[in-house]
A protein has these predicted regions:
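"Short basic amphipathic alpha-helical interaction patches in structured regions
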Residues: 81-83, 99-108
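Short, hydrophobic, well-ordered secondary-structure elements
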Residues: 56-97
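Short, charged N-terminal helix-start/capping segments
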Residues: 1-17, 51-73
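Short, contiguous, well-structured surface segments enriched in hydrophobic/aromatic residues
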Residues: 30-69, 110
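Long, charged low-complexity segments
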Residues: 1-43, 104-212
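Residue-level recognition of alpha-helical structural elements
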Residues: 48, 71-78, 131, 178
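Short runs of predominantly hydrophobic/aromatic residues within well-ordered alpha helices
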Residues: 52, 78, 82, 135-138
């Protein structure tokens, strides 16, 4: 019988290479956060550090939520969480590289004034990559999964005896989708680590590294 609740020893996608990489990055991220968090206590913080104190924990929490949903086989739910997860990581990068964006964040990040996820991605592409990486349609898939348009069906369909069906519970037979979610999550969690490290002047912690 399929377990009602999976544990790390019997989860359905255990052993997937990208899932293992995601796990290792999460451990490194939590280790770095344990170093940076105390630095935010007591001292006067910069505007960037105040933004990081909000955005970094939210990004990590969403990463852990995505990981747990994968463990329990709720892949569509994990996919839907990708947009708020990515948006926080992108916002953190955006306010780090854009002083006007940081000021707008400190003023409350008014939805009528703040840039969209797509516009932030376009700005970062120009700023960091000199426009070399096409970003057109960057937010399209994230929006599709979030808002439930017909295109979103691709992440919630499996084949049963050759017939496409839309599961309402655990999806235990889509390793490709599990890989896709991990592949999307890894670079953005890594970027959040980089921004956290930069905001608090810490070296990033990687697998096998030593901390003080």
């Amino acid at each position: 019988m399929t377990p009602v609740v999976f544990t790390p020893s019997d989860e359905p996608y255990l052993g997937r290479e990208l899932l293992c990489a995601f796990d290792n990055l999460i451990c490194s991220c939590l280790e770095l956060n344990a170093k940076c968090a105390p630095l935010s206590h007591g001292d006067e913080l910069t505007d960037l550090q105040r933004a990081a104190c909000i955005l970094v924990p939210q990004t990590i929490t969403l990463a852990l939520s995505i990981r747990e949903l994968i463990r329990q086989g709720y892949l569509f739910g994990a996919k839907v969480l990708m947009r708020p997860f990515v948006e926080r990581a992108v916002t953190l990068m955006y306010v780090f590289h854009n002083s006007e964006g940081l000021e707008l964040w400190n003023q409350g990040w008014d939805y009528r004034k703040r840039p969209t996820l797509q516009k932030m991605a376009d700005y970062l592409n120009e700023k960091l990559l000199h426009g070399q990486s096409p970003m057109k349609g960057f937010s399209q898939a994230f929006n599709s999964a979030t808002h439930g348009d017909p295109f979103s069906a691709q992440w919630n369909v499996v084949f049963h005896e050759g017939v496409p069906v839309f599961p309402v519970s655990k999806n235990l037979c889509s390793p490709g989708l599990a890989d896709e979610i991990c592949a999307e999550a890894i670079p953005w969690l890594a970027s959040a680590m980089g921004m956290m490290s930069a905001a608090f002047n810490q070296r990033e912690v990687g697998p096998g590294s030593k901390t003080n």
